[in-house]
Amino acid sequence: MSEMLEKARKYEFIQGQQIKEEERPAFHITPYVGWMNDPNGFSYYKGEYHLFYQYNPYSTHWDSMHWGHVVSKDLLHWNYVPTALAPDEDYDKFGCFSGSAIELEDGRQLLMYTSVNQEKLEDGTVRDIQTQAVAVGDGKDYEKYDKNPVLTAKDLPKGASKVDFRDPKIWKGNDGNFYCVIGSRPADGSGQILLYRSKNGFEWEFVSILAKNQNRYGKMWECPDFFELDGKYVLLTSPQDMLPEGLEFHNGNGTLCIIGELDPETHTLKEQFCQGVDYGIDYYAMQTLLAPDGRRIMIAWMQNWDTLAYRCNDSGWFAQMSLPRELSVKNGRLYQVPIRELNAMRTNKVEYNNVVIKDTRLTLDQIEGRIVDLELVIRPADKDNLYKKFELCFAENEKYHSTLCFRPDESVLKIDRKFSGSERALVHQSSCLVNGDSNELKLRVILDKFSVEVFINDGEQVMSAVILTKQEAKGISFFADGAAKLDIVKYDLL
């Protein structure tokens, strides 16, 4: 073990224990201590789910990327494992960036990651150089391959940047070979996804440019994932520098899902459908795994690079992962629902049916809390007179609240946290165009202390946001402009 890795493990062990359990979410992953961003190495190995993550144990700000590590039996209750990787080699001394994990034929676990070094140009300027490296281990301790890096600038197609070449996602193909997709930037400055192949996980060859951005969806495409699901091929990626397109794509760092067919001759993706992945404020760098029971499960960094100043300055940790989601493809669209394991945490059921709200704000007995699972069905009370607006307020007291607001005539759902307690002028609102019948809206709202995730119409769309309101703000209320009828089921999550 290197001195740098040993130092990180000792530091996190001491400092992580200073953070009380009640200061963390109940079932969302947070860093043991310090900073967290992209999920890495999301995998199932030796009877447990493993998640690694971009990690700086020494500060709640980004720097000196390590790989943190947690394991779980149920994807909801996670245990910390010592830091897996530190930037302790010449080829990765400026960071062990994002990557993935897979089990090898001999039973060892392979980690594949982006290794970052720097080079000095003739004019004296210095720039990052990104290559790909691997490490192997037993689920706790990992040793870097002595022939790293395994992919370098010589393995890039013509015109591709060696500065933006990152985030390998590895899987095993039906032909017995290992494959990986990597984000890249071509000569036009936008993004592309490269496909590589290996017989053993250590020696790689370039196969094709799987997909090209061509300056349609942002610029660089980060954190790609590629898999077959329900008879279609799905490419997930997180574009930088997005421009808005209606309510489908938002400014800044976004999410993109491309669904289509794979050409087996050219190894290129034939696009058929494109959509956002999450329509809320905080969701980036998705990664999936194939569970032993065949489910495709996705997790992401529930944060936004554009809202890093929305934070608790006295906290020993920064950022969290999303709730894992089960994926499916229906009618050319990606659907997402909370993992079914969450149902086992449900308790204290409270149910109301056919509650009519008209031009007033309503609270209901026992409908409150910050660790809850709330199911709502909203309909017009009078089919001939559509209500103008419905609001759900949560994390609410006399001073603070966040809201979900639905306007059925526009079919627009908006999440708004500007009254959540933030002292910074950041992104606090996001909207999506809800598909389907405006006469009925189904919502499943998952609250976990510092976040909200909203699943719309059985997972056709999802909105996620960090909510840092003080925990004593537990109120939940409902409002309708006009007359709306509600069915409500609330569970506490324990």
Name each model-derived stretch.
Residues M1-D167, K172-Y217, D230-Y279, M302-Y352, ...:
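Beta-rich carbohydrate-recognition and catalytic domains
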Residues R9-Q15, N253-L494:
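Beta-rich accessory regions
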